[in-house]
Amino acid sequence: VTVLSSALDPAAPDHRAHREAMLAKLADLDAEHAKALAGGGEKYVARHRKRGKLLARERIELLLDPDTPFLELSPLAAWGSEYTVGASLVTGIGVVEGIECLITANDPTVRGGASNPWSLKKALRANDIALANRLPCISLVESGGADLPSQKEIFIPGGAIFRDLTRLSAAGIPTVAVVFGNSTAGGAYIPGMSDHVIMVKERAKVFLGGPPLVKMATGEESDDESLGGAEMHARTSGLADHFAVDEPDALRQARRVVARLNHRKAYADPPLAEPPKYDPEELLGIVPGDLRTPFDPREVIARIVDASDFDEFKPLYGTSLTTGWASLHGYPVGILANARGVLFSEESQKAAQFIQLANQRDIPLLFLHNTTGYMVGKEYEQGGIIKHGAMMINAVSNSRVPHLSVLMGASYGAGHYGMCGRAYDPRFLFAWPSAKSAVMGPQQLAGVLSIVARQSAAAKGQPYDDEGDAALRAMVEQQIESESLPMFLSGRLYDDGVIDPRDTRTVLGLCLSAVHTARYEGARGGFGVFRM
């Protein structure tokens, strides 16, 4: 056992200052999460309850096994846009009859649960997670279809929702739809393309065209119930497999459907693991407010891995990147964590070798980000930083074991790519409130623009406006700073959620458990050409 020793002093002024700054960021985050929980606001929640209906999260709660966790995904979707935070959809992973399932629930208190561009992105991300991890998919449906004013952004890409449902089914991943209210127009294909369909009596309405559209198109008079009611679909069309008397009955029946799926995880759950030897509360004070100040990622690793036990790989070589083996909730993991921000040639080669080893052993990889990117300068360009950085990115791109990423601090430039950023398909990616991600730091980006403008003016023989330059730099810095914050990026679905650092071990444990529903095998060779 190689237990990490900790040099962290929780009473030190620096630690206390970092902790206070993190708590302030968490308070801001809670306020944004509260907006998602509030849905369409008091008026629409009251109207929904008056109709005798449960809210989206109440439906999920009744569906899940008692006292089991629900890992909500993309809760801040649409943050900073014209749409409601959460994007009128709740998605996440929960346990139903002992089986981990991917659950999506429309929030009908937000514009009737209608889909907007961010709900679409959020639903597609949920489908990707279900497919990659072979999680049964349960849709709790109550939606008026597409939000018509934004149809130009939804209609064409929105077809992927139905494509995904058929692909899940074709891959042997069960899909279940429980219809609580309207599921009209395009929304009618959700139950139409699910393996199992449950509808609530006198509430579920599933049709391609409602009475007004039918009247306009054919001249036929009809009503909701005869056109698409639950009883009609249960008795006549055969679209409903199960007929429920009310919402709790529908959710009870959904649980019975899942119990009968004969769906098994590819791997047995590991035995109960020993918790870390250090207090997770101390994670709040590790990341400095100024991300240019380095911190030791071993202090983080010591507070998230089983028994704080970590076997480091190449500890004396490429020391800006910490690599090594550990277990997390009993699951073996290989960890890559940035130690001093910048990645040099040595770190890149070390990472490529470590990723290959993890693939040889079929061990998932955890990337802990705090990087400003790859080193620049004459010495490093001549030393081959491009080909060595490319080697690391090649290894990450072609690795076949599951990857998990957590942005703790900076995640800038190609360093974000090398550390398995969103474009590299990690199974899950979460951010701490202290994280920042952009093409480069705000000061660097503003400075580069300033230098280019100054050189351009000199080449034309024009005087340079220093006052205007200072104003431009300030404006660019402010813009890049605001666009690199975790809530902004989470709103755009560039992560799966912004989490409290103290929850990191729990969140990663839930992710690793979900990952082990599907069988995986590392790449044996099969990496692109490494430039040596």
Regions found by a protein language model. Give the residues of each.
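Ligand-binding clefts of soluble mixed alpha/beta catalytic domains
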Residues: V1-M532
